[in-house]
Amino acid sequence: MNLLPLPLGPALVAAACRKSGHNVVLLNLMFAGDTASAIQDCVEGFRPEVIGISVRNIDDQNMADPKFLMPPVREVVKTCRRLCAAPIIVGGAGYSIFPESALRYLEADMGIQGEGETAFPALLERVAMGVPVSGLPGLHLPGQRPAHRTFASNLDALPLPEPGLWIPSHREPSEFWVPVQSRRGCDLDCSFCSTAAIEGPAIRSHSPTAIAAWLEQLASSGFTNINFVDNTFNLPPDYAKELCGKIIERGLAMNFWCIVYPKWVDAELAELMARAGCREISLGFESGSDHMLVSLNKMFNTEEVKTVAKMFADAGIFRRGFLLLGGPGETRESAEESLAFADALKFEALKVTVGVRIYPETPLAATALAEGIIRPDDDLLRPRFYLAPRLGDWLPERIAAYKASRSWVM
């Protein structure tokens, strides 16, 4: 599915700043043909006292041909610096995984790790008063110890952005799958995952009523295609069922797609999701080998994957599966087992990834360090990957052949 990029994170922070009484302009550079000119026009027209830059992705997670995405962001920082003297603060999901190394690389004035809806307005207040900003939750300053992070416990206390703040008016609403997040955090602790570094390990939720009201506001503006960016839509299951029920109660004629963890799903949930407008799920089952699922610290097994996949097929929902091959303990036999398993599931689409991106402070990073794949001083900002020993020559070629013979696989 091709999505026009919309900046949910900056929009949430911008909404919080407006609620605190600040004037805000949000510039989405994904739609800017000439980035430097777009920044110059915005700076000259708005004359900002503070500039915030959101960094969502560090790289493309492609081991075969990795693309490091930070150089253009550093150019954005340099352009802003050249045009005005306003302090530059970086944040966002990608930044939050690498708060110190990314801040050094980008040469910004400071960074906010994690949620910015509370920290950024507080920072603006201190800047306006001319008092030190150190000590704000999640704040990183060059050469100083980072402040302790905090996580909002009541997400409903945080404002949700109106469409006019962040969705371009010169495009048709039908062109967008609008990102919506109803929950933050993840306690599943998969061996390679960076979600906890971004959102924290505890699951926190907006009330289903608040999310349904936001969806209704979007629908009234013509935006009926929704991308739930929750790390796992089906967890907790009772919450997912209640949210679907609220959507159904309001009669919202919407379409949505989401990520599903292949456990803790029953037929009732799959049917409710279909009735609420779910058209597609991303099912990250990662492997068809129970041995490898244990290695990746997954909480499900292959039998549960089969059951969940069938439930969504029975509900008439398009299923896009995801395989992640080459992690610790992977062998030719386990990789072949995964490919045969994926074929048997008969997904409508399948994404196969070779090699696992190594993120800081994860079990995978510890394994890679112990095996000498990374060094103790490697900050991992530039993409590094784990591929099980003795699979380097064989696995990429095997997957290329597998994809070539199956039109639904990418």
What does each model-found stretch correspond to?
Residues 29-32, 261, 288-297, 309-334, ...:
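Conserved strand-turn element in the central/C-terminal portion of the radical SAM core barrel
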Residues 52-55, 116, 270-288, 350-356:
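Non-cysteine beta-strand/loop elements that form the S-adenosyl-L-methionine
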Residues 59-63, 290-295, 363:
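A short acidic, helix-capping loop that chelates divalent metal ions and anchors anionic groups
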Residues 140-143, 318, 333-410:
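C-terminal accessory regions of radical SAM enzymes
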